[in-house]
C-alpha cells in the first residue's frame, strides 16, 4: 500500500536527518526557538465562519505532478493576500516533492501561521518542525498508536505548536479525542486507497464536541461543498489541489470564500 511505502521512506529520511543534526541538537534548538516568530494556528482557525487553510503542494501520489511552474513563495503570498487563515506546506520529498526549505522560506515572508504537512512518525520531526519555523504540525492517526500520538501532542504543545490531528473513521476520532487533540481534521481521502468521499466529514462531524476545532480535508472543490460544510458547523477547510490547478489561485480562492 502507498501509505506503507511513504512511512518506510520517512523512516529512512529521519535516520538520515539525524546524521546531519543529532536528536539532542534538534531538541536544544527547538527549545531555543520555542517562541521565535510564533503565530497561533489554533487562534487563526477559531474565527467565525469557515477558515481556509490553503496548501502549497507540488505533487501527490494520486495526481502526480500538480504544479509544473512551482513558485511556492508567490503562491503563499497570494494565499495570504486573498484571505487564507493559514498555509499548509508539504515537506515530504519522495511522494509529494515537498521540501523543508519551502516551509522555511514561506515562513520568512508571511504573517499567517504555517502548518507543516508531512508524515510525522518520530519525535525528532516534532523538534525539527519547530526549528524550521512551523507553527503547527500534522499528526496522522493512521500511522500513530494512541500512546505515540499522545506523546507527540504533548511534545508539540510544549514547544508552543498546535497540532492538526487527522482522522478518517470513528475509531481514529475516538483516539484523537482521548489523546487530547484540540484541532481535529477529517480526511475525506482514504490514505490506504486514496479514494475520496466528501461525505466522510459530514458523517464524523457529530462525533467531535463543539469546543474542538473541526477541519475538513481533501476533495473540496466547489462553493456548494463549502456551503454544506458551513451548515454542518465545520470550522475550517484544507484545500490545495483545487487551488493549485486553477490557473488563477486568487480568483479561485475568492470564488470559494465569497
Swiss-Prot record:
Q: Which UniProt keywords apply?
A: Amino-acid biosynthesis, Aromatic amino acid biosynthesis, Decarboxylase, Lyase, Tryptophan biosynthesis
| Assigned protein family | Belongs to the TrpC family.
Q: In which pathway does it act?
A: Amino-acid biosynthesis; L-tryptophan biosynthesis; L-tryptophan from chorismate: step 4/5
Q: Which PROSITE patterns match?
A: IGPS
Q: Which reaction does it catalyse?
A: 1-(2-carboxyphenylamino)-1-deoxy-D-ribulose 5-phosphate + H(+) = (1S,2R)-1-C-(indol-3-yl)glycerol 3-phosphate + CO2 + H2O
Record's protein name = Indole-3-glycerol phosphate synthase
- Per the record, the domain of life is Bacteria
Cysteine pairs forming cystine bridges in this chain are none
Alphabetized GO MF terms: indole-3-glycerol-phosphate synthase activity; phosphoribosylanthranilate isomerase activity
Enzyme Commission code(s) on record: 4.1.1.48
Organism (species): Endomicrobium trichonymphae
Give one GO biological process term: L-tryptophan biosynthetic process
Amino acid at each position: 500500500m502507498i501509505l506503507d511505502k511513504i512511512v518506510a521512506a520517512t523512516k529512512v529520511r529521519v535516520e538520515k536527518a539525524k546524521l546531519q543534526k543529532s536528536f539532542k541538537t534538534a531538541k536544544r534548538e527547538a527549545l531555543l526557538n520555542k517562541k521565535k516568530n510564533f503565530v497561533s494556528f489554533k487562534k487563526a482557525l477559531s474565527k467565525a465562519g469557515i477558515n481556509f487553510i490553503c496548501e502549497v503542494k507540488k505533487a501527490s501520489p494520486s495526481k502526480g505532478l500538480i504544479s509544473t511552474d512551482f513558485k511556492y513563495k508567490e503562491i503563499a503570498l497570494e494565499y495570504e493576500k486573498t484571505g487564507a487563515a493559514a498555509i499548509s506546506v508539504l515537506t515530504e520529498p519522495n511522494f509529494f516533492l515537498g521540501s523543508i526549505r519551502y516551509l522555511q522560506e514561506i515562513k520568512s515572508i508571511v504573517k499567517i501561521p504555517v502548518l507543516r504537512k508531512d508524515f510525522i512518525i518520530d519525535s525528532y520531526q516534532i523538534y525539527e518542525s519547530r526549528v524550521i519555523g512551523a507553527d503547527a504540525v500534522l499528526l496522522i492517526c493512521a500511522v500513530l498508536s494512541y500512546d505515540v500520538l499522545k506523546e507527540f501532542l504533548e511534545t508539540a504543545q510544549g514547544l508552543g505548536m498546535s497540532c492538526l490531528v487527522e482522522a478518517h473513521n470513528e475509531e481514529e476520532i475516538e483516539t484523537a479525542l482521548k489523546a487530547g487533540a484540540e484541532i481535529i481534521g477529517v480526511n475525506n481521502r482514504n490514505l490506504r486507497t486514496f479514494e475520496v468521499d466528501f461525505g466522510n466529514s459530514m458523517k464524523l462531524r457529530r462525533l467531535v464536541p463543539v469546543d474542538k476545532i473541526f477541519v475538513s480535508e481533501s476533495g473540496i472543490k466547489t462553493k456548494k461543498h463549502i456551503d454544506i460544510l458551513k451548515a454542518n458547523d465545520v470550522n475550517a477547510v484544507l484545500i490545495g489541489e483545487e487551488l493549485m490547478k486553477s490557473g488563477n489561485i486568487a480568483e479561485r480562492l475568492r470564488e470559494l470564500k465569497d
